[in-house]
């Protein structure tokens, strides 16, 4: 259930994002989901990669500031209100979501990557409410 996400801190300059994608592509590492957030000084690239430990090593060797973070992925119907229902369940159980990003591959379902404040509690709550979590191995294969 727990997925290793890479968080890469990028200087705000042309080409840095391309360097990351080029390094991982050359190493045969696929990026199945990603989000890029910007601040005035740097960007944060969060991604799920097919081989997170290998990607971490490659990026560190290239002198990127990078770390692994535990996240989970909720498989949800891709329809109005589905995310709100899941978040209502979590907030009702006092589970705080630090951030999330989502993607859809078939327009019927959406995969929502979640970074909760308490990952084990979040998993328990979602499973107790019969919500489907995507396994790490499935995420890494996408």
Give each language-model segment a name.
Residues 1-142:
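A conserved regulatory-domain signal marking ACT and ACT-like small-molecule sensing domains
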């Amino acid at each position: 259930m727990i997925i290793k996400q890479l968080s890469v801190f990028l200087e705000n300059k042309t080409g840095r994002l391309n360097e990351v994608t080029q390094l991982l592509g050359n190493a045969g590492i696929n990026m199945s989901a990603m989000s890029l957030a910007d601040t005035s000084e740097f960007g944060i690239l969060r991604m799920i990669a097919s081989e997170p430990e290998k990607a971490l090593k490659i990026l560190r060797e290239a002198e990127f500031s990078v770390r692994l973070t535990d996240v989970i992925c909720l498989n949800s119907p891709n329809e109005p209100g589905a995310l709100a229902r899941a978040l209502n369940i979590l907030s009702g159980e006092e589970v705080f979501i630090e951030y999330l990003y989502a993607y859809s591959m078939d327009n019927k379902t959406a995969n929502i990557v979640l970074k909760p404040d308490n990952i084990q509690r979040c998993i328990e709550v979602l499973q107790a409410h019969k919500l489907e979590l995507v396994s790490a191995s499935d995420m890494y294969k996408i």
